[in-house]
Amino acid sequence: VVDERIPFTIPVEGDNAVFTSMYDNFPDRIEIPVNERGRKVAVLAAASISLMQSRMDNGRLRVNLSDGTHRDVVLRDPETIDDWLGSGTGKPYVLAGHPVSLGKNAHGHLYEIDLGGDRMVKSVELETFTNETMIGLLGITVLQAEK
């Protein structure tokens, strides 16, 4: 995501995104090993959320640290995430957070999760809680401590 000065390397070929959902053909929770040290974790995500699922906790991003603690971001439409197509409007309607253009009237969300200092990141989890919701993890970057 060049505009935000946060590097995400997304492979052109092969699997480059993972989605969670309550639908039978998706996992409702995934955990991705990270095992890197940094001061923040930047996560690029996108969601498809039915309007009937707004104003409730749709999912959660969790950064697990090597000391057993974690940092959570609750994904709640429209407070911290919204539908990637803006529910047909083509415009983000999220109330907070940082929408990022994915091109052609689509958008995702950039989350910068502060770790409270230089910490070892064990993994990142994504979990979906509501029906008629798909949440995708498009990229993870650990931001190193400034030198």
Feature map (PLM): residue ranges:
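N-terminal/edge-of-domain interface segments
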Residues: 1-147
